[in-house]
Amino acid sequence: MGISVEWYNEEKTIILQTYDGRWTWEDFQDLTRVIMPKMMGEVPHTVHILSDFTNSDIPSMNGALTHAKHALSGYGDNWGYLIVVGGNSMVNMLVNLFRQLFNNSVGNKTFAAPTLEVAFDIAMQYDDAYEAMSE
């Protein structure tokens, strides 16, 4: 129970955060301020983040947008997309609200997806667009 984090693939281009059962905003802050920057600092290339809320009990929604904004603004320059997976209607509403309120590089890089498979496809769209720009 809580939050676990691991590399989703051997290439270290995607980090999977799994929110399972109960967790706290303190757990979230530890993850986003310590663990995530360390992992993302291991590699020079773009890293996408899949945050799986499928089996999560969300703590109080008070301050959720502020917590998310501070977390994302602290990620390294190699941060690609954040894709929130399997969230309930409240989580999906918060993702959409976040995208509208922070309509800049942070909001434009944040998405919701119903499954990990769809989230992976969204991450690959970023990579395809980046490759096309590099050619």
Describe the predicted segments one by one.
Residues 1-135:
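Amphipathic, Lys/Arg-enriched alpha-helical "gate/interface" segment within cytosolic domains
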